[in-house]
Amino acid sequence: MLNRDSIDAVNFDPAVEESLQRITAPMTTAASYVKSVEDAIYTHPKLTDDYDAIDVYIDTERYTIVPRSVAEDSAAMRDIADSLYPSERLNVVCTCAEVPPFHGDDGGEAFAAMFIEPALEGFLRRTFVQARIMHRMVPLTRYFEACGRLLGNAGKMHIHRRAHAVDIIAFDGKGLSMANTFATAGGDD
């Protein structure tokens, strides 16, 4: 998980019992966020080992949920990025990962579209070959959707509390209704 001030990683071999290792790499106050990420990764060589599969989850507020037709249209994604983040015009790239289907009659596929700096995406793709780069909400929506299938598909709202934010994911019995993150000041928020 690529956070604002650290990288949290786990690695394991599914064929080896008790092989799970956790790595926390604090980020420095380098000249840029991308440089901080680079420094944190290169300071912990275990992060650059050769793995069979690598998933990189990024915690950023710059994301939205869109239908497949929009996710596959680079001009539409550029328009969305420009309208959501006008001060960063042409300075973001979009990565998409499938989330549970939208609710409604069409049941269309949904994607979490995340907007990140081109330099960050370039570094991650060079450093972690064939890594799947996605927003941190992707595994949460998939997990809660799977729980809903096991426990019945009635409408459910799931809340994932973090130190300074809360993730709310809602399903209406037909599919994903909402997935959003809200900043919080403290436990009473």
Give residue ranges: language-model regions.
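Accessory, usually C-terminal, subdomains that scaffold auxiliary metal cofactors
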Residues: G175-D189
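Gly/Thr-rich phosphate-binding beta-strand-loop-beta motif of the actin/hexokinase/Hsp70
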Residues: M1-A15, G148-K174
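Short, surface-exposed loop/turn motifs that are enriched in glycine and acidic residues
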Residues: A110-M114, M157, T184
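Active-site neighborhood for divalent-cation/phosphate handling
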Residues: D8-A146
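Short alpha-helical interface elements
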Residues: A81, E145-R149, N153, T184
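A short secondary-structure junction signal
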Residues: L124, I169-F171, A179-T181
